[in-house]
Amino acid sequence: MGLDQLIGNNRIKNILHSYLRNDNIPYSMLFAGAAAANTVGFAVAFAKAIQCLDRNDDFCGVCRHCEEIDKEIFPDLKIISPEGQFYKKEQIIFLKEDNYRRPMTGKKKIFIVKDAQKMNENSANAFLKVLEEPAESTMFILLTKNLNNLLPTIKSRCQILNFTLPTPEELKTFFMGKGIEESQAELLSYLGQSGIEDVVEDNVDDLMEKRRRSLDILIKLSNKTNVDEILLDLNTRSRSRDKFLEYFTELVNLLSLLLRDIMLLHIEEESGYIINIDYKETLMNLRQQLPMAKVLYLVYRMELLFRDIQRNLNTKVLILEFIKSYTMKEVSHV
């Protein structure tokens, strides 16, 4: 049990172990990296190690505190997310008040602040005051995908750790160690390198189902069948912007990998570099429907969509551009 069960970022694991071993834990830390680097998983594991009743430089996983954290009922670990597109000033004011309350059962009161880059000027300035006047028994772990969107004064008060995506070798070794066959472990390692969050969170069954649904969407879009059904589903999901963007990013990512394989099959039918090898027969059929020029165009369009997601474009615009990429016609009823 412990931090070492997480995939990748061994340098950061060593740093966290050192903090725990020397009992020299910063009161505010900033974990920077893509969601697929599993910053949330590392933050929870580090918080668990701090609160563990039987720790040396890691958590035991079996004490009462560890079990309560796993069940998400531990009173002195709180994970905070923005209410809407940005954090509201009222959220930060409540956090400031809670910051001064003593821990109920834990060694510290720990706040994990997800998407810290989503603080606007008002909420960021309010949070800065919290960091400037920390309570002795409180700790903050901020998570961000983009360091550049945080106030320099907030960054200067945090110990910053920069996370990277696990390497294909780390991912493959991890999954083979769990008894997964080499071919599937290799597939998962490719998906993890493409930024698929489920891989590093070890949600393999969920990922396989998402991949199957992505292939189904690609088939329907290529055949121009059930496009209205896909459009309706995307519009329904877009009612919750954050959840939609999470889903849409994964969909675009998985479609890009499927298109990459079709492109390779155009070049060489027996290519040994196919990622979705278990779908090869279906991808061969899609190759007949999607000429190389169309595949290259779609790969390019998916790259543009990734950029547009980062630019926080309106969800309706993202959906429109996505559908137009495959149908090559205007969709007026988005």
Predicted regions and their residues:
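Structural signal for conserved beta-strand scaffold positions within catalytic alpha/beta enzyme cores
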Residues: 79-81, 142, 160-162
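Charged, glycine-rich active-site and insertion segments that engage polyanionic ligands
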Residues: 1-49, 65-68, 136-138, 146-254, ...
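Conserved adenine-binding aromatic site and its adjacent loop/helix in ATP-hydrolyzing domains
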Residues: 97, 129, 156
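Catalytic acidic motif of RecA-like/P-loop NTPases
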Residues: 114-120, 125-132, 148
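Conserved catalytic/switch belt of AAA+ P-loop NTPases
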Residues: 100, 125-142
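Clamp-loader machinery-focused feature within the broader ASCE/P-loop NTPase space
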Residues: 2-122
